[in-house]
Amino acid sequence: MTKLTVKDLFEKKGKVKLTELYVTNALEAHAAERAGIDIQIVSFKKETLRTGVPTNRWFRDAHIKDIREAAPNTFMIYGLGQLSSPDKAIDAALIARDNGADAVYCGNSPKYIEALRNEGLPAVSHIGLVPYKSTWTGGFKAVGKDAESAFKVYQ
């Protein structure tokens, strides 16, 4: 299995179906890679470690590295979580990249994505079903299905 690049993703868009899976640990990442999953979404949640000890940046960094080591040939997108500023998103994305992530998922506003792009950091986000914004959209439902309504969601 050859690891995808951002360039590959752009070239395959609309032409090739890719598989994507959320993994929580190195065992899942390894199994997913062996199964041929193209893209893995990873995030750091202290409950996924189940260590019973306080977690900090060292644990997060080790978590990303463990998953990268377990799945060296899979495109990894690391979920940044909710951050308080575009600068903090850049800092977190640089740390994720330095620990093995190929891109980051950032669910914040477009100005965060723009800041990441301006720094050359590949970022993924979406408009549509955004669970943490369900109170704004009237529940868990897909929104922005056409260009006009998508632009309203974007605004």
What is each PLM-predicted segment?
Residues 1, 24, 55-63, 84-88, ...:
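Short secondary-structure boundary/capping elements
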Residues 20-22, 39-41, 75-79:
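Short, conserved beta-strand segments within well-ordered enzyme catalytic domains
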Residues 1-22, 136:
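N-terminal amphipathic alpha-helix/helix-capping segment at the start of soluble metabolic enzymes
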Residues 19-23, 103-106:
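Short, hydrophobic beta-strand segments that form beta-sheet elements in well-ordered domains
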Residues 25, 32, 123:
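Conserved, mostly hydrophobic/aromatic
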Residues 2, 19-20, 60-66, 72:
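Metallocofactor- and cofactor-centric catalytic cores in central/energy metabolism, strongly enriched
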Residues 73-77, 83-155:
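Conserved anion-binding
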Residues 28-67, 101-116:
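Glycine-rich, proline-tolerant flexible connector loops at the mouths of alpha/beta enzymes
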